[in-house]
């Protein structure tokens, strides 16, 4: 009985340690507000509300453009490729929002602002495009390009993941950015995220939370099963002992 109780306690300790490690890692939320002008890239990217990259101020505290040089370079090359595909010379505004679990991309999108009110969205996990409005279908077809899709996918899934893994965990301790996010209420070309697409983003944002609950439920089921097995074993031993005593007294 004492041996089985010790075994159960040890198993519970292992499971709780695993659960604690899972919950403590959580997910990282990445967001970028970028503007592609002629030969220049402006804007910043933040993780969990803290500045990760700032292309407008190299001296900004917490800026990791040098530590994540491959990411910075890939973003600049991507901006050049997008400008080459763009019709006209207007500034191109891009917004991206994505989620990472222990540095691994689990969901998100890359949004291209087509005018003051509409955007088109690329989802790298399933390599699909969506428009915020049906009138944007022609603009979406214009941006569909295999090389562009591959470059966006590499930036979000490969280069951002490498940067997060390289800077984790100390980048989470950096002070929060004091730079204001671009004002989307003004009449500018800033990318606007529409409610119809926010639902999709919300689904990807909650994937990490769903994973955590799945782990909790599985661990709870394992613990309950182990407790039941120990209880059944103890009851069986007790029943056998009672039968032995009964047969001895009869004899």
From Swiss-Prot:
Q: Which residues lie on this side of the membrane: Extracellular?
A: 25-212
The GO biological-process annotations, alphabetized, read as: natural killer cell mediated cytotoxicity
| Gene3D superfamilies (alphabetical) | MHC class I-like antigen recognition-like
Q: Where is it chiefly localized?
A: membrane
Give the sugar-modified residues.
63, 93, 126, 189
Query: What is the induction comment?
Result: Up-regulated in response to infection by murine cytomegalovirus.
Tissue-specific expression: In strain C57BL/6J, strongly expressed in cardiac muscle and skeletal muscle, with lower expression levels in spleen, liver, kidney and thymus. In strain BALB/cJ, weakly expressed in cardiac muscle, spleen, kidney and thymus.
* Localization per record: Cell membrane
Q: One GO MF term, please?
A: natural killer cell lectin-like receptor binding
An example Gene Ontology CC term for this record:
plasma membrane
- Please indicate the ranges of residues that lie on the Cytoplasmic side: 234-251
User: What keywords does the record list, in alphabetical order?
Assistant: Cell membrane, Glycoprotein, Immunity, Membrane, Signal, Transmembrane, Transmembrane helix
Q: Report which superkingdom the organism of origin falls in.
A: Eukaryota
Topological relation to the membrane, as annotated? Single-pass type I membrane protein
Which residues are listed as membrane-spanning?
213-233
Q: Which residues form the signal peptide?
A: 1-24
InterPro entries with a match to the protein in the record = MHC_I-like_Ag-recog_sf, MHC_I/II-like_Ag-recog
Q: What does this protein do?
A: Ligand for the KLRK1 immunosurveillance receptor. Binding to KLRK1 stimulates cell lysis in vitro.
Which protein family is it in?
Answer: Belongs to the NKG2D ligand family.
> What is this protein's record name?
Histocompatibility antigen 60b
């Amino acid at each position: 009985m004492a041996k089985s109780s010790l075994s159960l306690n040890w198993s519970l300790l292992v499971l709780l340690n695993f659960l604690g490690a899972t919950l403590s890692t959580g997910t990282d939320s990445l967001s970028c507000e970028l503007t592609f002008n002629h030969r220049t890239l402006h804007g910043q990217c933040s993780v969990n509300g803290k500045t990760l990259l700032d292309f407008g101020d190299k001296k900004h505290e917490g800026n990791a453009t040098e530590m994540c040089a491959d990411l910075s370079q890939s973003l600049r090359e991507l901006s050049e490729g997008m400008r080459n595909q763009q019709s006209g010379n207007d500034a191109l505004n891009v917004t991206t929002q994505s989620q990472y679990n222990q540095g691994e991309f689990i969901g998100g999108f890359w949004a291209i602002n087509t005018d003051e009110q509409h955007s088109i969205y690329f989802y790298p996990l399933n390599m699909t495009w969506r428009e915020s409005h049906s009138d944007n279908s022609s603009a979406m077809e214009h941006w569909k390009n295999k090389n562009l899709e591959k470059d966006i996918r590499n930036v979000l899934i490969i280069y951002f993941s490498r940067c997060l893994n390289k800077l984790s965990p100390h980048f989470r301790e950096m002070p929060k950015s004091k730079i204001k996010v671009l004002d989307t209420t003004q009449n500018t070309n800033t990318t606007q995220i529409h409610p119809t697409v926010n639902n999709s983003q919300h689904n990807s944002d909650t994937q990490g939370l769903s994973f955590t609950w799945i782990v909790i439920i599985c661990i709870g089921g394992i613990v309950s099963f182990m407790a039941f097995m120990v209880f059944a074993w103890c009851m069986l031993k007790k029943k056998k002992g009672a039968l032995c005593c009964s047969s001895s007294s009869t004899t």
